[in-house]
Amino acid sequence: MRRKNRLFILVVLLGIVLVVYYSQLNSLDLVEPVQSSSSGNGGCWSYYEGLTPGWLNDFYDVNQITPNPAKDVIELVTRIKIFFNCLQQVDGHNIQRLRDIEKKLFPYINFEKLETDESAFWHTTTRWNGEVYHASMLEFDPKNHQFLRSKPINFDTGLSFWENWLHTVTQSGSKGIVISASDVQLNETIRLLKVLRFIKNDYPIQIVHNADLSQDSMKSIIKYARSLDTAEYPAQELWFLNVHSLLNPKYSKKFTTYSNKWLALTFSSFEIPILMDSDTVPFVSIEKFYELEEFQKTGVLFFKDRVISDDLFESSELKILREIVYGCIGLDLEDESKIHEQVEDPVVAQVLENMFIKKYKHHLESGLVILHKGKHLFSMLTSIALQFSPIAEYFHGDKDFFWLGELLSNNRFTFHPVDASNIGQLGNVVSKESTGEFYQICSVQLSHTDRDGSLLWLNGGLNICKKTSWEYDYEHRQRLNDMFQNADELREYYASPVKLEGIIIPDTSISGWINSGECFLFNYCTLFKEGEFGKLIKFKEDEKLRLSQIVDIWNKDI
C-alpha cells in the first residue's frame, strides 16, 4: 500500500512539473529564454534511449518526401535542445554515451577522424605572411585586435565536442570579420577587402573555405589586402581557414553556395564573429556594429529583409510551420492578437505576424550577421539542422533559418528595428496630382540604416547589376530594349558603378517593393511621396563625396 502511495505521489509531482513547464512555454517571452527541466544524470540523457533505434539528425535531400515534416523537424530540434540542456544541467557525463549522441546529432562532423587520427582532424589556418597554424587556437589582443600567439588545441575528452570548441579551440571574447569564399567569389571578396581598408578596419579577417579556394586566389586576396600599407589605407590582418578536414566526407559536398556560410560562422576562430557576404559593403566602422543596441542586449545582430508581398507561403506550408513552432516552444500563431499577447518583443512579434498571418516569406537579410557563439552556439546548430530539413524548400537560401533557429531554441534575439531600404539614384516622378517631392529609386542594392538615418551597410555590391542577365533582359524587357542599342551596350551599363544619391524606406502598407523584372529579378523599385508615404533620406554633398569614393574603390579594375 505504501508503495502504491509513493508511486501516486511521484506521478502527481511529475504532472505538476509538466504543467508548470508547459505553462511557461505557452506564455512565451522571447526576451527571457526558458530552459527545460530535468533531474539527475541518467534522467536527462535517458531521453535518447527512448528514441527509435537508428535515429539520426540526417540531412534531407532537396524535394525528399516525408510523410510528417512537422514531426520530423520537431524531433530534430528537440534532440539538439535536450542535448544542450543536459550539458548545462548535469555534472559528470558518461563520455561514451555522450560521444554516441553527438555523432547522431551532428553527423556532418568527422568524429571518426577525431577519434582515430586527431591531428589530421583539426583545421589549418594560414596567415597572410605564409605562417601555417595547424590544430591551434589563435589569440588576438582584445584592444588593438593584433595577433598575439597560437596555442596547441588541447582536446578535453571529458567534455562534448562543442564545449571543447568554445573553450579549447576558440579564444574567449575574440572578435573578427568572417567571410565565406571560394574561387567563385574571388573578385567580390577582393572588392570587400578594399572597402574594409578604406574604412580603416583593424579587426582580423578570416576567409573560410571548404578546400575550394586555390593558392592563386589566396595570393590575389593577400595582394589587395596588404599592398601599399598606409595610415589612410591600412593593410589587413588576413587569415585563411580551411575547414574541410572537420567535415564528414559524406556531408562535406552538401555545404554549397549559401550553406557554406554556416561553416564560416561555426568554425571561425572568433567567439563573436561578424559574418559578411562577399558582396556586402560596410560604410561605418566595424566597431559600430558591435556597439548597436540589439547586439548588446541579445548577443546577436539581425537585419530585416525587404517586405515582399507577392512571394508568399502556401497555406499548407504555414500549417506545418505553425505545428513546428507550437511543438517546439508552445507558441500559438493562429491569429495576430495571440502573437502580440505571447511575444514581448514588438519587432519579433511583427516578424511573426508578417510570416504567419500575412504569409510573407522574406524576413531576415543575412549579408551581415553578428552572433556570440558563447550564447547562441546551439541555436546556430539548430539553424544548420533546419537548413537541411524537410522545410528547407519553403525558404530562400539560408536567410530566415538564422532567426528561426533562435526562435525554436527559445533563445533571446531580436532584429535591428529599422526597415530595409532601397539605395541609389533618385528619379523624379512626374505627377499632376502631386505638388511635393515625389521620388523613385530602382536598384539591386538593399541598404540598412541606423535609427538616425545614417547608412550602415548594403548588400549587392556597387555596380548596376552583377548578374549575367544582359542578353535575356535586353530581349525581354522593352524599357531596356528602348534604352540601349544592343545587349553588349546593356552589359557595359550593368557593369558600371552605381550612383548613391539617396535612400527610400518604403511604406509597404501603401506602396511596397516592386520587382522591375530586370537583373535576373534582383532589381526592385520603391516610391516616396512627400506627406503621403515612404521615408526619404537625401545624402548631403559631403556624404555623397565619401560614398562616391567607396563606390570608386569597389569598382576599380582588379
From Swiss-Prot:
BP GO annotations: protein O-linked glycosylation
Compartments, record wording: Golgi apparatus membrane
InterPro entries reported for this sequence: Alpha_mannosyltransferase (IPR022751), Nucleotide-diphossugar_trans (IPR029044)
Glycosylation sites: N187
Residue intervals on the Cytoplasmic side: 1-6
Bilayer topology annotation: Single-pass type II membrane protein
One Pfam family, short name: Mannosyl_trans3
GO cellular component: cell periphery; fungal-type vacuole membrane; Golgi apparatus; Golgi membrane
Protein's UniProt keywords contain Glycosyltransferase: yes
EC primary class: transferase
An example molecular function term from Gene Ontology annotations: alpha-1,3-mannosyltransferase activity
Keyword Transmembrane helix: yes
Involved pathway(s): Protein modification; protein glycosylation
Bridged cysteine pairs (disulfide): none
Source taxon at top rank: Eukaryota
Biological role stated in the UniProt entry: Mannosyltransferase involved in adding the 4th and 5th mannose residues of O-linked glycans.
Family, per entry: Belongs to the MNN1/MNT family.
Protein name per its UniProtKB record: Alpha-1,3-mannosyltransferase MNT2
Taxonomic classification: Eukaryota, Fungi, Dikarya, Ascomycota, Saccharomycotina
